[in-house]
């Protein structure tokens, strides 16, 4: 297991200085950092495959919390999009005991991402008096789970009634799946409404847009990470959007990982970046609806890439946009932007924002 320990030791060093996404300027150091992070993730995935088997690699992402323990033999996976929690183990001895511990800890974990290393098997999950999943999961009696006694009883129920096993030809995988409550997304969103309202007032950005960005980026997962090392609820990258915001606020350097994993700081930084896109980078677009479409797309792929859809000259691009209807701007960005991800992103955020405006 030495190579896995080595991976865990170097992970914080590589992750802390890697970046991509949400910006148009990348210097050579950032490219090297991104390549280093890609290498790390590739090695991490390869190691998981060696332990779990082919097609069994599951790694944390923007909308997926994945934590390995027990020398990588047990994992907890929360899919925030699907609303499912899957606890699995390949432990050869007492698999039920491994599952039971993981179930209890997952149900009772707090909401401090900076205290948990998702790229190692260190059991650093602490039981919280205010569990992150409280209200998003109910036990077999229909009650929310706050205390260890109720979590333990629910774990015993699950192991007795919902334990499954399967073979991948290499290992026997034991698992338990828990469905979250139907409105789990709203439950998570509600946790951050106060922070969203504060950032909205501070920067003059519509609450519905902030919430739509959060839903699209992370599904309100405070543990959100990505292969491009975007962090937290609004998936802010330290060296691009984070650095731009710090510079605009008269701060030197870049926001730390712990800063961006703090929900209030992440929402503040992400909203500040939206304001910069709206007021500075894309401020030459007159129609507020057209500008909103451009801002949304730029949050994903950068302001420069948005303007280049219309012209390589930024001023001319804004002038062209100003001759178009908002509907034509939307149609152009969702069909002609070079990034398929950015094209879909505008559709997703715009759709989500409509739902928040109706509330």
UniProtKB/Swiss-Prot annotation:
Residues in the signal sequence: 1-16
Reaction catalysis annotation: Exolytic cleavage of the (1->4)-beta-glycosidic linkage between N-acetylmuramic acid (MurNAc) and N-acetylglucosamine (GlcNAc) residues in peptidoglycan, from either the reducing or the non-reducing ends of the peptidoglycan chains, with concomitant formation of a 1,6-anhydrobond in the MurNAc residue
Keywords: Cell outer membrane, Cell wall biogenesis/degradation, Lipoprotein, Lyase, Membrane, Palmitate, Signal
BP GO terms, sorted: cell wall macromolecule catabolic process; cell wall organization; peptidoglycan metabolic process
Annotated localization: Cell outer membrane
A Pfam family: Mltc_N
Lipidation (N-palmitoyl cysteine): 17
Membrane topology: Lipid-anchor
The enzyme's E.C. designation: 4.2.2.n1
Xref: InterPro entries: Lysozyme-like_dom_sf, Murein_transglycosylaseC, Murein_transglycosylaseC_N, Transglyc_AS, Transglycosylase_SLT_dom_1
Principal subcellular localisation of the protein: membrane
SUPFAM superfamilies membership: Lysozyme-like (SSF53955)
PROSITE patterns: PROKAR_LIPOPROTEIN, TRANSGLYCOSYLASE
MF terms (GO), sorted A to Z: hydrolase activity, acting on glycosyl bonds; peptidoglycan lytic transglycosylase activity
Lipid anchor positions (S-diacylglycerol cysteine): 17
Superkingdom of this protein's organism: Bacteria
Function text: Murein-degrading enzyme. May play a role in recycling of muropeptides during cell elongation and/or cell division.
Family statement: Belongs to the transglycosylase Slt family.
HAMAP family, per the entry: MltC
Name this protein carries in UniProt: Membrane-bound lytic murein transglycosylase C
Species in which this protein is naturally found: Escherichia coli O81 (strain ED1a)
Lineage: Bacteria, Pseudomonadati, Pseudomonadota, Gammaproteobacteria, Enterobacterales
């Amino acid at each position: 297991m030495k190579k896995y320990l080595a991976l865990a030791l170097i992970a914080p060093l590589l992750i802390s200085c890697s970046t991509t996404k949400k910006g148009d300027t990348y210097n050579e150091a950032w490219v090297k950092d991104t390549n280093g992070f890609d290498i790390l993730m590739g090695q991490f995935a390869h190691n998981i495959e060696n332990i779990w088997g082919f097609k069994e690699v599951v790694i944390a992402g923007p909308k997926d919390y994945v934590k390995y323990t027990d020398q990588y033999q047990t994992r907890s996976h929360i899919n925030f999009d699907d609303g499912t929690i899957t606890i699995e183990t390949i432990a050869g001895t007492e698999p039920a005991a491994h599952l039971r511990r993981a179930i209890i800890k997952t149900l009772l974990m707090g909401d401090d991402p900076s205290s948990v290393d998702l790229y190692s098997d260190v059991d650093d999950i602490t039981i919280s008096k205010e569990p992150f999943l409280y209200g998003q999961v109910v036990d077999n009696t229909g009650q929310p789970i706050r205390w260890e006694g109720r979590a333990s009883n629910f774990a015993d129920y699950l192991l007795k009634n919902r334990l499954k096993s399967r073979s991948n030809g290499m290992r026997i995988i034991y698992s338990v799946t828990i469905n979250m409550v139907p409105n789990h997304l709203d439950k998570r969103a509600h946790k951050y409404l106060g922070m969203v309202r504060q950032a909205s007032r501070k920067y003059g950005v519509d609450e519905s847009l902030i919430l739509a960005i959060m839903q699209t980026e992370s599904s309100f997962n405070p543990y959100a990470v990505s292969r491009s090392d975007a962090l937290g609820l609004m998936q802010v990258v330290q060296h691009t959007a984070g650095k731009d915001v710090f510079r605009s606020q008269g701060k030197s350097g870049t926001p730390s990982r712990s800063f961006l994993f703090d929900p209030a700081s992440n929402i503040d930084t992400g909203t500040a970046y939206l304001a910069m896109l709206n007021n500075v980078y894309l401020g030459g677009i007159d129609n507020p609806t057209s500008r909103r479409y451009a801002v949304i797309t730029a949050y994903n792929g950068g302001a420069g890439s948005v303007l280049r859809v219309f012209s390589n000259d930024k001023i001319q691009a804004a002038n062209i946009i100003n001759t178009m209807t908002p509907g034509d701007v939307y149609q152009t960005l969702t069909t002609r932007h070079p990034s398929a991800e950015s094209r879909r992103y505008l559709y997703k955020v715009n759709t989500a924002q409509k739902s928040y405006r109706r509330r």
